[in-house]
Design a protein with these regions (language model features):
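Conserved P-loop NTPase
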Residues: 1-2, 99-106, 112, 168, ...
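The Walker A/P-loop phosphate-binding site
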Residues: 1-78, 95, 99
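Flexible beta-alpha connector loops of hexameric P-loop NTPases
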Residues: 5-8, 33, 58, 80-88, ...
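Conserved nucleotide-binding/hydrolysis micro-motifs of P-loop NTPases
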Residues: 36-38, 63-67, 75-78, 89-93, ...
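Loop/turn-to-beta-strand initiation segments
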Residues: 55-57, 81-82, 102-105, 142-149
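Short regulatory helix/loop adjacent to the ATP-binding pocket of P-loop NTPases
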Residues: 73, 158-168, 198
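Substrate-engagement module of ASCE P-loop NTPases
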Residues: 127-148, 152, 168-179
């Protein structure tokens, strides 16, 4: 079998392309998960409208009406004239739309509401998620198109549905939203066509997701003046170095056993470092 270099499809977001390994690969299936309100749908709608200026894109929503989608796009000031949209949850009908429109990229929001009409189980069940994911994976390979699946997560932080879902897809990303922060981090956990653990950073604004061009600036709170108990250091995230700030506060203790507490660092890991 001869290996052919695939022409990647840029998303219009350098941070998203970084996590993908340079853009979407034709014939691949991408899964993006995250907490409710993290911005998964917002990010993908922005990327879809940007892609639609040069590529055929089909955005399928199963969780909101077309009117709601249009209102969201209007609020974000996104051009919708070149984007094909559909409100549908039946996998077979979506396949017919793909056959008829021949898009290069298909967004499905979300995999947990998609269903196969031949199955008796309810949408979101283990059987439905497994079979619809398998169906869309075959569809992507058959037509050499990109299919992006939005996935809900459980209370434990994993993707809702069978574990086999993560094995079917080619790329798995998580969009995290730290409590009380407007910043979002997109991290790749699996990528058959690029490096894993790549990190993309965005800021949620009134007009949607904006890329953070200099992530080190948001991790450093120190000024030019030296501050006792504070240092700047470098950490690697994927292929990118980031400057972060470490702060320490020491106080006298009357008890026989001093207590060590860390914010942003696992307590067991802290104990190992201090041992």
């Amino acid at each position: 079998v001869e290996a052919v270099e695939a022409q990647r499809i840029g998303t219009g977001f350098a941070e998203l392309d970084r996590v993908l390994g340079g853009g979407f690969v034709p014939g691949s299936v991408v899964l993006i998960g995250g907490d409710p309100g993290a911005g998964k749908s917002t990010l993908l709608l922005q990327a879809s409208t940007a892609l639609a200026q040069h590529q055929g894109v089909l955005y399928v929503t199963g969780e909101e009406s077309l009117q709601q989608l249009a209102l969201r796009a209007k609020r974000l000031q996104l051009p919708m004239e070149h984007l094909s949209v559909a409100a549908e949850t039946r996998a077979e009908v979506i396949a017919q739309l793909v056959e008829r429109q021949r898009p290069k990229v298909v967004i499905l929001d979300s995999i947990q509401v998609m269903q196969m009409e031949a199955l008796d189980s309810t949408p979101g069940s283990v059987t439905q998620v497994r079979e619809t994911a398998s169906f869309f994976t075959r569809l992507a390979k058959q037509h050499d198109i990109v299919i992006v699946l939005v996935g809900h997560i459980t209370k434990e932080g994993g993707i809702a549905g069978p574990k086999v879902l993560e094995h079917m897809i080619d790329c798995f990303m998580m969009l995290d939203s730290p409590a009380g922060s407007r910043y979002r981090t997109l991290r790749g956990h699996k990528n058959r066509f690029g490096a894993v653990n790549e990190l993309g950073i965005f800021a949620m604004t009134d007009l949607g997701m904006k890329e953070v061009a200099n992530p080190s600036a948001i991790f450093l709170q120190r000024g030019d003046v030296d501050s006792p108990g504070s240092i700047a250091t470098v950490t690697w995230e994927g292929t990118r170095p980031l400057l972060v700030e470490l702060q320490a506060l020491v106080d006298d203790v009357a008890a026989g056993h001093p207590k060590r507490v860390a914010v942003g660092l696992d307590q067991q890991r802290l104990a190992m470092h201090l041992a």
